[in-house]
Amino acid sequence: MRTVLLKGPILSRSGYGEHARSVFRALQSRPDLYDIYVEPTIWGKTPWSHNVSDENKEIFKCINKRMQFQGTMNLSLQVMIPNEWTNIAEKNIGITAGIETDLASETWVQFCKDIDHVIVVSNHAKNVFLNSVYKDKVKVANGQLMDLRLEPEEIDVIGYPVKNKESEDMGLDIQTDFNFLTVAQAGPRKCLDATVRWFAEEFKDENVGLVVKANMQNNSKADRYNLKNTMKNWVKHLEGRKCKVYLLHGNLNEDQIHHLYNHEKIKCYITTTHGEGFGLPIFEAAYSGLPVVAPAWSGHVDFLYKKIIKKNGKPDRKPLFTKVKYELEKVQKNAVWENVIVEDAKWAFSDQKSFKKALRNVYVAYASKKAMAKELKEFLEVEMAEEKIHEKYVEVINKVYPPEVFEVTEWLQQIENNLETHD
């Protein structure tokens, strides 16, 4: 059995936290292969989950095991941004959501080269890494600096699995019968201000709603107060509007989140995101059967298209969402994050007219959009089934740390133990 250290923000209420928990579940699916240890990290200012679920109990057991462990583990899986990865085990796999822009930083590419293998959550993230090429500051060939670049075999893509969650009714007071939904943090990347403002402008004189599950930094009362006032400013130019914007703020468990996707009055998920490494809320909405309106760029397009075979026998992809036109433009200055979102990177800027038209199309032709969403839901339930995702992790781990390597290591350890016994 291999000793495996899972390092990442596994207790945080964040995308990376959910990513770490997804990897934890994959490891748990093979107790015959993996002896799991957990080292939790923080993720920004996001809160930690301390509930007493069965999963959290197992996580805390693995944390306690880690605190008592001495020596070097066989393998580490590090669910973190690349510049936080370290070589702490015999073999090390870096796992990241990747990048939401069209360019990975030189620092990230170097860290990817310095670790044994990389796993990302989308083909978008993989392609961005492969296309981000720099000059190596150390390696020279024929008097020229060599390219610092990743090769396809150094990166694998493993997305999130579909979850089978119950729907916990929260008793929401939604007065409008037809409502859109968006889930986002109110920062530069999600472009939440445009989502809210353009919705309100399109449905100013109609009895239509938008449910916004959001925060700015955390789930505190102060955060809610600040976000509420910020959102009021986004729509203050629309005096006398009939449409409603509902703010949902605070901690929700997974059953409550899935209740939003399955609420009888919530009809469609919408976003004007600049870019996604994967887009977990979009994915959850899609596999819950909600129609989706989104720009057709970055990580979420992986799961919003259905794989099909054309009449000529060639593979193709069928879009099962309502596309929003966009332009790739340089990231805003307030979005630049050293060694993460670089100044020269670009991401998508949704077209206002196209977004409003997409909302209107869903509203007036809902039956056809719902049928399209049902087709996508059925595809994802098979394509992204939990068992398949778990198998992919096992396959990649075996590639990086083959079973025969482990068996030899274990055999040598047994010989050493026997020698000590005879001494």
Say what each PLM segment does.
Residues 216, 324-423:
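C-terminal amphipathic helix plus adjacent low-complexity
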